[in-house]
């Protein structure tokens, strides 16, 4: 179906985003090399990519090109500069392996029908975006954002397993009831917001990514060919499953003389801090799978974070995210 035209074009200057003393480090961290169940099937590259502080990105709130140009001449910069043109695309079947790589630890180390979950994402072409590098022969997927109705595919094995996983890791009884409501009784009004990407993707891509997602949701409510489909995008709540780092022993860890304050929580994705601030409820759980990290993160544990955000908070989120990145 044809996209509605969007207006406006802005050029932003890329600067590393810092939410904690470690966030600059994390923003340039290499994507951890992880094993696939069928590695021979994967045609996507996970080569390390780094970006310098003077890169500029035209900000397009629609599918199209997000140009990333490096013009750094700082010889003392230890990061290798790479010139890349990012483009936003509708999901398509050939993105299967790239999306599967991004999502392989989405439910920690649980064995589940991830392939069917990826299929659900790729079949929904009117809402959702994948980010690639222009003219990349491998068509590696660097980012994904989409929103899936929790009831539309409720009979799919992957959604049954996802719900089972969330119930199992939710140990807080007062929140378990709220979670159950979104998983079952109110599922038709819930969008599972899936956002995964390589860790060093420039943060300036975030506002157009999320603006595009929520614009597409609004358009789908009006433009989908059947009332059933239009109804499936009238989300009242969004459910998010993501990851953060938590300090292992916060009460015992005190900054030494001359050190910066130690953060209890490090957000791998800066927008997750905004979602958490706006959430109606949330809970964390320890993860058995661990990302490859630096020495600076040795005192932190990777945790899963599940949160619910009411749809009426999304305009505020978009405003906060744009202000943050600008």
From Swiss-Prot:
Residues 72-81 have a biased composition (Acidic residues). Signal peptide: none annotated. The modification Phosphoserine is found at residue 45. It comes from the Eukaryota. InterPro entries: BCP1_family. Keywords: Phosphoprotein. GO terms for cellular component: nucleolus. Residues 37-81 are annotated as: Disordered. PANTHER family: BRCA2 AND CDKN1A INTERACTING PROTEIN, BRCA2 AND CDKN1A-INTERACTING PROTEIN. This is Protein BCCIP homolog. It comes from Arabidopsis thaliana (Mouse-ear cress).
